[in-house]
Structure formats: structure tokens, C-alpha cells
């Protein structure tokens, strides 16, 4: 963590383009970011729909880890990143000067994170997970938080929870790892989950939707310095991303999928578009990715109860802002 914060300090010393160096009213016309294999992020969709013009995204690679994504934003390797809200709270609490600006993924009845076992598995409940391996995309983020909450709600002690082994598996390999019995439980979400279900032979043990209902789970972040120096660019980015989220909500599913397939094919990263056809919904609870205080509070409270945060160590207002969201007034005036 010290290395990350040291890099944050160095990133803060870098010069950023000012208004005079960028065209028009935007402080910078280029935003560095990481993508995700075989999927389309909302900023990428916003760019393709023309909502982000004249600002352009500069892809520097892919990530499968939310914590790594926001660390890269904190150190200046990228201009923005995204992660589970609990992971964002932990990094900000450690001293990283980040601010969440818009929700970008979550769970609803169609789009959720499920924990799956093979048909016929002896694992039927939380107690059965003791001594077993659970495969997930990264540690310290959504998958781990939800699993531990499930175990706690079902009466496991801290010592018993420690006996459940977490194994990092790239999302595209998780289904295969389960079927080959390299893991006992697979954490699957979105299109990869639906493809695995289509292939048959797996059963849901539980899901985050079962525990919490519909909720926005993760946010996109910028550093506070970037926001201060590039407020018009950040405002345009949030507006464009919010509009892209709502475009997927109001556009026929087939049209959304076709657009995603087109974006993946055009960018030429040698990706499989097969899983995109399983897209169902944005999974974001509030209009335009508006962030509700409760979507951070639940995880801050959880971390305080677990002893990772001291009571009052993290102020919710320090974690996020809705000031750039075009739907802010509409939502708050309801």
C-alpha cells in the first residue's frame, strides 16, 4: 500500500493539460482507461454513441480486477478506474485521494453475481463451504464481500470462515475451472453466468441479489486532483456515461446487443463476441448511475464491524459525489 501511495504522490506532481492546451471548453480531450475482455463498458458505449464527443478514450489494456483498476487510477497510470464500492472505500481510507463520480455496475433480478456448484455437489448450504474452494476474479472486492456476508448471515464463526479458501480465477476461465473440479464453487455474473447456465449442469447456491435485492455495487473514480483540474472534462464524462446507461435501459435488448457486438468488432482486440448475446440489463439501480449514500454505507458499516475501519474513520461524503450527474436534480426532487 505504501508503494501505491508513493506513486499517488508522484502522479500528483505530473503536469496536466490546462484549458489553453485542449480544444474548446474541455481541459483535456483524452482519457486513459482499462477495458474488459469481451465486454463493453458504459464509457466505451458513450463514446460510440457520440455522447462523449469531442473527448476520446485511450485504451491502455484490460483488467479483471476492480482493486487494481482503481489503484491504477490513483497512481496516474489511467485517468479513471472502476471497482466495487467496498474496495473503493478501503483504498480511500488508506489515503488514496479518489472520488467516485458515477455507478457503473450492480445487481437486479436479471443481472447479478451468483455462486454456483456442479449439479450433484454435496454443497447445499453455507456450512458445507468449510474446507472448500471458491473461485472468483479477485480478492478484496465484490465477490469476497458478498461471500463473507453470506457466511456470516448463516452463522459461521470467524474461524470457520477462514477455512473457506478463495482462489483467483480469470472470469473467462471460471466455468471451466468448476467443471474440471479445480474449484468447488464458481462466482459467475452477467453474460458469462448466462452462458454457463446455457451449458447446463450447474446449480445456484446463492446470489448477491438474494442477499441485498437490487443495488448499484460499483463506481467509476477519478483522483480528486484530476477532478479539480479537469472539471468540465469530468462533467462531460459523467453526463455521457449516464446517458449511455439510460440508452441501454430504454433501447430494445436486441439493439443493445448488436451495438455491443459492433463496438467489439470495430476495436479489433481479437475478442470473442459470443458472450455478449447474453446481455440482459444494466443492473444499475438508480437512473444514470446516480450514487445513493446507502450503496457505500452498507460496506463502510460492514468494514467497521469487521474491525478494518475504526468507527468514524471514513466519512461517506468523502467517498463519492453526484455533482456531475445530469439526473441529480430529477432524482433528488422526487
Q: Locations of the language-model features?
A:
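Conserved C-terminal helix/tail region of periplasmic/extracytoplasmic solute-binding proteins
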Residues: 297-334
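Pocket-lining segment of extracytoplasmic ligand-binding domains
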Residues: 167, 172-263
Amino acid at each position: 500500500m505504501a508503494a501505491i501511495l508513493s506513486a499517488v504522490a508522484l502522479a500528483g506532481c505530473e503536469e496536466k493539460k490546462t484549458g489553453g492546451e485542449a480544444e474548446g471548453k474541455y481541459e483535456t480531450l483524452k482519457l486513459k482507461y482499462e477495458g474488459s475482455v469481451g465486454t463493453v463498458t458504459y464509457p466505451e458505449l458513450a463514446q460510440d454513441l457520440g455522447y462523449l464527443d469531442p473527448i476520446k478514450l485511450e485504451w491502455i489494456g484490460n483488467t479483471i480486477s476492480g482493486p487494481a483498476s482503481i489503484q491504477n487510477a490513483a497512481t496516474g497510470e489511467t485517468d479513471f478506474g472502476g471497482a466495487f464500492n467496498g474496495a473503493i472505500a478501503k483504498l480511500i481510507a488508506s489515503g488514496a485521494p479518489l472520488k467516485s463520480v458515477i455507478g457503473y455496475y450492480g445487481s437486479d433480478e436479471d443481472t447479478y453475481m451468483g455462486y454456483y456448484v456442479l449439479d450433484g455437489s454435496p454443497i447445499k448450504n453455507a456450512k458445507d463451504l468449510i474446507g472448500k474452494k471458491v473461485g472468483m476474479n479477485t480478492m478484496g472486492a465484490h465477490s469476497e464481500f458478498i461471500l463473507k456476508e453470506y457466511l456470516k448471515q448463516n452463522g459461521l464463526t470467524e474461524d470457520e470462515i477462514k477455512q473457506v479458501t478463495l482462489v483467483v480465477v480469470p472470469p473467462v476461465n471460471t466455468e471451466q475451472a468448476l467443471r474440471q473440479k479445480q474449484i468447488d464453487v464458481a462466482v459467475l455474473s452477467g453474460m458469462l453466468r448466462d452462458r454457463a447456465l446455457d451449458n447446463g449442469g450447474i446449480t445456484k447456491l446463492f446470489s448477491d441479489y438474494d442477499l441485498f435485492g437490487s443495488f448499484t455495487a460499483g463506481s467509476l473514480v477519478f483522483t480528486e486532483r484530476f477532478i479539480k483540474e479537469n472539471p468540465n472534462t469530468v462533467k462531460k464524462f459523467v453526463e455521457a456515461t449516464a446517458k449511455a446507461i439510460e440508452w441501454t435501459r430504454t433501447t430494445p435488448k436486441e439493439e443493445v446487443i448488436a451495438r455491443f457486438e459492433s463496438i467489439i468488432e470495430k476495436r479489433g482486440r481479437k475478442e470473442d463476441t459470443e458472450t455478449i448475446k447474453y446481455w440482459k440489463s444494466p443492473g444499475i439501480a438508480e437512473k444514470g448511475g446516480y450514487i445513493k449514500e446507502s450503496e457505500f454505507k452498507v460496506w463502510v458499516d460492514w468494514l467497521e464491524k469487521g474491525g478494518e475501519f475504526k468507527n468514524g474513520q471514513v466519512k461517506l461524503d468523502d467517498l463519492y459525489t453526484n455533482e456531475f450527474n445530469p439526473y441529480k436534480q430529477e432524482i433528488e426532487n422526487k
